[in-house]
């Protein structure tokens, strides 16, 4: 008999599972453009969709690597044999994924590229991909012994309110260089997309859409309208008049 679990414990257990799975995949697939994970639970099995920019590297030669990852996940989280399946899905718009861009910037800095040049390259690529705005912050020992932070901003960026939850994609990464650890923070403001493919379907609260007026048909000849006759209204009852007495 399966043990009963309260709703509160179920939500906590699901959150811990997804966080631990995300941390494991981030560590394993960092060089393959790992950009997130989706978990879909069906009655028969659990489907784990890995979002990455280089899906061929995630799959490996003849699917060997994805099978190894499936075996590790199955053993670590105690799934029954054949009840968990891993899939690799390519990120549709790499320039609008904050995790992919943070990893890209991380490898540029590891390769010895200057901070300013690397950040402006990422900024330009994000804006060319159709983002409404972006912000890149790099902090740490950038030049001297004193730690400082450099911020690079382009376009529009919102910082407060409910739309931040679904319009702004954020990612934080750390890179270990010779002089110390640098922190990387990338924020991308997604565009409004009614189809929901590259951005949220819901428009911003302050978005004003102007509807084009319909073309009026100007009559060329005089016309007359035949209106239907009004139905006879019932007459109000006549009140009896008081009779004057002598």
Curated annotation (Swiss-Prot):
One of its GO terms (biological process) is translation. Residues 212-246 are annotated as: Disordered. GO terms for molecular function: class I DNA-(apurinic or apyrimidinic site) endonuclease activity; DNA binding; RNA binding; structural constituent of ribosome. It catalyses: 2'-deoxyribonucleotide-(2'-deoxyribose 5'-phosphate)-2'-deoxyribonucleotide-DNA = a 3'-end 2'-deoxyribonucleotide-(2,3-dehydro-2,3-deoxyribose 5'-phosphate)-DNA + a 5'-end 5'-phospho-2'-deoxyribonucleoside-DNA + H(+). CDD domains: KH-II_40S_S3. InterPro entries: KH_dom-like_a/b, KH_dom_type_2, KH_sf_prok-type, Ribosomal_S3_C_sf, Ribosomal_uS3_C, Ribosomal_uS3_CS, Ribosomal_uS3_euk/arc. The keyword RNA-binding applies. Keywords: Apoptosis, Cell cycle, Cell division, Cytoplasm, Cytoskeleton, DNA damage, DNA repair, DNA-binding, Lyase, Membrane, Mitochondrion, Mitochondrion inner membrane, Mitosis, Nucleus, Ribonucleoprotein, Ribosomal protein, RNA-binding, Transcription, Transcription regulation, Translation regulation. PROSITE patterns: KH_TYPE_2, RIBOSOMAL_S3. Residues 21-92 form the KH type-2 domain. It is found in: Cytoplasm; Nucleus; Nucleus, Nucleolus; Mitochondrion inner membrane. Its main location: cytoplasm. It is an enzyme of class 4 (lyase). Gene3D superfamilies: 3.30.300.20, Ribosomal protein S3, C-terminal domain. The keyword tRNA processing does not apply. Component of the small ribosomal subunit. The ribosome is a large ribonucleoprotein complex responsible for the synthesis of proteins in the cell. Has endonuclease activity and plays a role in repair of damaged DNA. Also involved in other processes including regulation of transcription, translation of its cognate mRNA, spindle formation and chromosome movement during mitosis, and apoptosis. Belongs to the universal ribosomal protein uS3 family. PANTHER family: 30S/40S RIBOSOMAL PROTEIN S3, SMALL RIBOSOMAL SUBUNIT PROTEIN US3. This is Small ribosomal subunit protein uS3B. The gene is rps3-b.
